[in-house]
Each structure stands twice: as C-alpha cells, then as structure tokens.
UniProtKB/Swiss-Prot annotation:
Membrane topology: Multi-pass membrane protein
Secretion signal, residue range per the UniProt entry: none
Annotated glycosylation sites: N5
GO biological process: signal transduction
Lineage: Eukaryota, Metazoa, Chordata, Craniata, Vertebrata
Membrane topology, Extracellular segments: 1-26, 81-101, 160-197, 262-273
InterPro entries: GPCR_Rhodpsn, GPCR_Rhodpsn_7TM, Olfact_rcpt
Protein name: Olfactory receptor 1082
Ranges annotated as spanning the membrane: 27-51, 59-80, 102-121, 141-159, 198-220, 238-261, 274-293
GO cellular component, one term: plasma membrane
Positions in the Cytoplasmic compartment: 52-58, 122-140, 221-237, 294-317
Keyword entries, A-Z: Cell membrane, Disulfide bond, G-protein coupled receptor, Glycoprotein, Membrane, Olfaction, Receptor, Sensory transduction, Transducer, Transmembrane, Transmembrane helix
Length: 317
C-alpha cells in the first residue's frame, strides 16, 4: 500500500502485544486469562451482593454496583480479543473491529472516571451534610447523574471515533499495544490536522482533570468536616466511610497517569502495552478486593451471599 492512502484502504491493523517471543505466549495467555476471570467473578460478586442485600440499597452502593459493571465491560473490551489472538497466533484485527474496540474502550474508561467523581460527591454529602443526605442524594438524582455520565462518555467516544475515521495512515499499520488505543492510533497517522490531534490528545486529559478536580474538592471539604469532629472515634468512623473509595481513586488515577507519562517519555515499542496493564487489567481486578476488605458492609454481604449459595448447593446436592 502506498504511503498516504486513507485508512479505508486498510483491511486490518496488527496488534504487536507485549513480546514477539513465542515462548512467552503461553505464560502471558495463562496470566491474563486468570486475571480476567478474577476480575469478572470479583465484580459480579459485588453486584450480586448489592442486589440481593436490601441494606445495601443505598446511593453509595448503587454507584459501586455500576462501577463494578463498568470494570467488567472495561476489561472485556480488550482482554478477550488479546487472548483469542494469542491462542490463534494471529496479531490482526480488522479496521472496523479496531475502531469499535477503541470507541467502546473510551466509553467505559470515561464512565469509570465520572463514576468515581459522582461517588466522591456522594461521600461529600454524607460527611458534610448527613442530616440532609437522603433528601439531596435521592433516587432521582442518582439516576440523573448516572445517565449524565453515560451521555458524556458516549458522546466523547463518538466524536473521537469520527475523528479517527477521517485520519490517514502512512507506512506500517502495526500498533505496539495489545488493543486499539486512541493515543497509539494518533501516533500512526500522517494526517497533518492540528485541530483533530488537539481534540484526540487534549479532551481525554481535560475530562479526567475535571473529574479529578471534583474529587479533590469533595475530599477537601470532607477532611475539613472530619477535622471539626471532636472525638477520635468520630473522626475514624467518618474517614472509614471514604477509605475504600479513596483507595480506588488513588489506584485509578496513579495508574492512568503512569500510562500517560510512559507513552510520552519511553520509546520502547512494547512499553506502552506493559504500562497499560496496571490501568486496564490490574485496577479493575483489585477494586472488588479493596471494597470487600475495607468495607464491613460489603464484606458481610459477600459472606451472606456465599453462605446462601452453599446452603442451596447442600440442599440440591
């Protein structure tokens, strides 16, 4: 194919993955299959525990269940295709599948970003306005915030996809990654379109910065509120309600920042893929463990859920 041809002339891209050493493919396949199964099972357990336990039918756990759903979809966007490619010893992905994967990945990446900000607002109201919590964070507001997060995420992904569809690629269409990632596609293009590149690179950063600023403001107000509590026990109880969310926020944004910095600084062909593992695979896998270990209500609900399943299995057996 000649340099400068439109992307519509390409039938497929090639995902280079982590390594070209075939001896490591089985190890990578087994590792990522295990992490994927743990991610799906862990987040499904969180969702089932919240649905089946009536005392968890609160705004905080409503958003947590949605975050678990997003984590499952977020990981499912990339890992199954990578596992299929390793199993079939193929690195190709069709042009249409690549754009679709990028679009869906952006939707759930932004959804996770916005849900963390919404959960921070929920914690802010709970800690700073406890007497008005049920009035402010009502069912209608929860649905509205969730729908708003979906709409913005889908709109952003749709705009980015339209931009990519107009790009021109030159030379090899090899992506040094294990999935079709927006930044990698923007680096492959030879289109000299400054507005398009600005939108592709700046808008995701701006959306993340807006959400993160909201989280920082919420926790600034929470810390100020906790500081005014006179007893140590009261301070500990107030902080413990935010500990799990704060841990997930720290993990999500630190790994995301690590991916952004590594892709901008390190020039190794497989460095971006390796750095993305923490953000795209490890973080969704750890989220259920963070909430189940640090949150007594979730831990108790999971124990009841598992005990109930054991009893059902005993009676049916």
């Amino acid at each position: 194919m000649e340099s400068g041809n439109s992307t519509r002339r390409f039938s497929s891209f090639f995902l280079l993955g982590f390594t070209e050493n075939p001896q490591l493919h089985f190890l990578i396949f087994a590792l990522f299959l295990s992490m994927y199964l743990v991610t799906v099972l862990g987040n499904l357990l969180i969702i089932m525990a919240i649905i089946t336990q009536s005392h968890l039918h609160t705004p905080m756990y409503f958003f947590l269940a949605n975050l678990s759903f997003v984590d499952i979809c977020f990981t499912s966007t990339t890992i199954p295709k990578m596992l299929v490619n390793i199993y079939t010893q193929s690195k190709s992905i069709t042009y249409e599948d690549c754009i679709s994967q990028m679009c869906v990945f952006l939707v759930f990446a932004e959804l996770g970003n916005f849900l963390l900000a919404v959960m921070a607002y929920d914690r802010y109201v709970a800690x700073c306005h406890p007497l008005c919590y049920t009035v402010i964070v009502n069912h209608r507001l929860c649905i509205l915030l969730l729908l708003l997060s979906w709409v913005i995420s889908i709109f952003h992904a749709f705009i980015q996809s339209l931009i990519v569809l107009q790009l021109t690629f030159c030379g090899d269409v090899k992506i040094p990654h294990f999935f079709c990632e927006l930044n990698q596609l923007s680096q492959l293009t030879c289109s000299d379109n400054f507005p398009s590149h600005l939108i592709m690179n700046l808008v995701p950063v701006m959306l993340a910065a807006i959400s993160f600023s909201g989280i920082l403001y919420s926790y600034f107000k929470i810390v100020s509120s906790i500081h005014s509590i006179s007893t140590v026990q009261g301070k500990y109880k107030a902080f413990s309600t935010c500990a799990s969310h704060l841990s997930i926020v720290s993990l999500f944004y630190s790994t995301g920042l690590g991916v952004y910095v590594s892709s901008a600084v390190v020039q190794s062909s497989h460095s971006a893929a390796s750095a993305s593992v923490m953000y795209t695979v490890v973080t969704p896998m750890l989220n259920p463990f963070i909430y189940s270990l640090r949150n007594k209500d979730v831990k108790r609900a999971l124990e009841r859920l598992l005990e109930g399943n054991c009893k059902v299995h005993h009676w049916t057996g």
